[in-house]
Amino acid sequence: MVENMETSFKSIDLIQIMDKWQRKWDESKIFETKHDNREKFFISAAFPYLNGVLHAGHLRTFTIPETIARYQRMKNKNVLWTFGFHVTGTPILGLANQIKEKKEDIIWAYTNLHNIPMDELLKLDTPEAIVECFSKKATDAFKKMGFSLDWRRNFKTDDKVFSKFIEWQFYKLKDLGLIKKGSHPVRYCPKCENPVEDHDLLHGEESTTVEYNLIKFTSTFDEKDVIIPMATLRPETVFGVTNAWVNPDEIYVLAEVYDEIQKLDSEDVDLKYNGLWIVGKECADKLKEQDKNIKILKEFKGSELIGLKIKNPVTNLKVPIFPAEFVEMNIGTGCVMSVPAHAPYDYVALRDLEKVEEVGLISLIEIEGYGKYPAKEIVEKMNIKNQKDEALLEEATSKIYKDEFHKGKLNENCPEYKGTSVKDIKEKLIKDYMNFGISEIMYEFSEPKVVCRCGEKCIIKTVKGQWFITYSDENWKRLAHECIDSMEFAPENLRHEFHNKIDWMKDKACARRKGLGTKLPFDTNWMIESLSDSTIYMAYYTIARFINAGINENQLTSELFEYVFSGNGNLAEISNVSEVSIEIIEEMRKEFLYFYPLDWRCSAKDLIPNHLSFMIFNHVALFKKEHWPRGIEINGYVTIEGKKLSKSKGPVLPVLEVSETFGADVARFYITTCAELPQDADVKFKEMEKARDNLIKLYELAVLVTKEGIIEKELSIIDKWLLHKTHSSINFAEKAYEEFHLRKIGLMFYELINDLRWYKRRGGDNNGVLKEVVEIWTKLLSPVTPHLCEEIWELLGHNGFISKEIFPNVKIEYINEELELGEEFIRFTMEDIRNIKNVAKINPEKMYLYTADDWKYELLEFMNKNSEKNVKELIPIVMKEERFKRHGKDVMKLINDLMKVGVKKAIAEVEILENAKTFIEKEFECNVIIGGEDFNGKKKFAIPYKPAIYME
């Protein structure tokens, strides 16, 4: 009856099925929701940015919560699942300008990768046109994928009504003292004249701002007293400086340096003289943007500095400057401290110059496992010959720095700090150096290439009069840590990473001079930037349907939001001023209180250090503890046939293209089951085709079941086995959905396909059983492949939507582990028979199967009762039993053998083999005898679950 499952129904049109059920869902509005008496479930994903089409990365990140939302509905929960669209900031402005200028790379990317026809693309020369175009395409993509969203709650972040919500948020943060104004170093685009965030960048999205210490060495140059600052991330190493390095072929400058001191309550500055500095020309350009006024007096090559003696401000030692071509001018000042006792690069460079004896080595850190001069020691141990051995030098440096940080302590050459561990000294030294006036701060990017979407290279700029959110506030961090401790994480190991991100969080610029979005309500010259207006919008989802039904921005006062989200204020007065009825405001508050807190927030891992961490910060500041988020799910990235996604270079794989090519269900099934959460998912089109073929098999079985009808008959062993396997799957599937282990759903489905093949081989042909299997699996798969499952559900004669059905319950009477072990035993026995046949190269006429002696089953039972013991612990206990002891060495061998095959429950092997005798005979075309005469003493080799086999 299931033979036809091995062929595909080529006539099945998954696209047609997809369109049919999307239309029915849309007409019935079954995914619209409001507060009621059921248990609620609120899940959301980071909304997409509308500067392109939704792609494969979006597909994975969004399909995971979509699947969980459908599952939770089947658990009879009231599910809130919806989407907004992010348009804040400058990327859309930049894209409009690039299209207007007909930039070749942009035109190519959007016509070839985003599939925008040329005539349509050239019309997208305004931000408004781009937002309209891509919001429609995103909506179409969500609908084409069958997302079960409540569309009444959709919004864009430049909607005037949403801006009023953000104004409330920022007024409240300011009232709490969490927004301040001052000078602040930010990533900055000189062309856009704006701070830039991760979403604004073409390259360097994960770059951070790194704080370097400039140690102010002094000397005399051109008969003038000069400061030669040297950048370091390790201020303790100043104690071990023996010389300095400059690049002889690069350009340096002698410049008057003035500190820019911002006047109180003003963006104007006073200038304070800071001396004559010698730095690289590129460094001077950077310092101009970081609170320094630079007046260049002279440009010269680094070779003029060679041999100059400079004074170490910490040790007062005078050390020479040597030439080094390895000095990079794009990082730091172009002048580098040399610490050869602890830096392999410095030691090898000095050795190449034959200067080691001249300057000597100064030890400053004691490390367990190393001698006095770790760099010299590791260079000699790794046989590093010269500076060209870059890979080895990098490895040596990494190892020493790691060991010094974790295990090192400062020695007697650091008098006041002797005995302090390296990992604990940095902040104290920075503070001390600053107090002594011998150190300053300079900022660099953590990555060499940071480029704005407009194509301009970004810089770090100290913006004056900048508004920033004080994420460095220790009390605020304490609340954020408390929230993280109370949350669930999928996967769980993310908890530690979030704690780390909170610890390292610094103040963040929250506004810029231009862009789309919301004006800063208390300083309208500034626009709130994109990572600051996207932290609590999940709360807005809860009330968006009321606002979208006809409330305008003038009615949305901060007092109204304060009442809805905090319960503060006089309701009658708020209603009177806003002209929103008391009834509506009360409904808004009820809806918020019902659906909040957010149960799960879903995103890809790139948002951990920014959006997701900011979400936690803002929730703990603005909402009561009972409304803090409960869970965060993070997935890995997506590649296409091994290639990294790129909006500008490709591949992209638009979501609409996937749905039109494979159908939504195939795409949904594949993208959610091809990899575990933290792993990156690689989309392989051949595998998607295989997934499609296997899904069609379930439909084929449903067709065959309905065609042939149901004939009542007694359940056979193999019928009971299939029912056991199917009902066992219910618990496994439930656990997988609850824990976001969606890959397991796919593996279970593929196991079902194999189970059905085995059922057929074993002679299974009970239509009633097969129908029950199809019905259960249609429900189990419905959250992942809803269109196909709706079609099968209808085919099986059911009314209504499977999307609104209750998740199946396990029928305990069908659960029988012995049946599963029995079929597994038969399958493995047949594999052993096949292997023996192949090795011996015979086709037997008779085959004898010998099961194990009774004492071996007794030992198996004994091992089951002591399953927590390992082999070493088990053997002494077993040998105390006389019934086992008399079998001597055979016992120890059997214990090891049973451990290898897996310690399982003892089963009635003789009875199972007798029941399967006809099946085995048919498979191998020979007579099978269970037991019988012991030929060649074979029986003694039988162990539980592994019969001995004799063929003739």
UniProtKB/Swiss-Prot annotation:
Gene Ontology molecular function: any one: aminoacyl-tRNA deacylase activity
Coiled coil: none
GO cellular component term of the entry, any: cytoplasm
Top-rank taxon, per record: Archaea
Principal location class: cytoplasm
Sequence intervals crossing the membrane: none
Biological process (GO), any one: leucyl-tRNA aminoacylation
CDD domains (alphabetical): Anticodon_Ia_Leu_AEc (cd07959)
Keyword match Ligase: yes
Chain positions of motif 'KMSKS' region: 644-648
Motif 'HIGH' region per UniProt: ranges: 48-58
NCBIfam families, alphabetized: leuS_arch (TIGR00395), PRK12300.1 (NF008957)
Family (UniProt): Belongs to the class-I aminoacyl-tRNA synthetase family.
HAMAP family with a match to the protein in the record: Leu_tRNA_synth_A
Protein's UniProt name: Leucine--tRNA ligase
Species name: Methanococcus vannielii (strain ATCC 35089 / DSM 1224 / JCM 13029 / OCM 148 / SB)
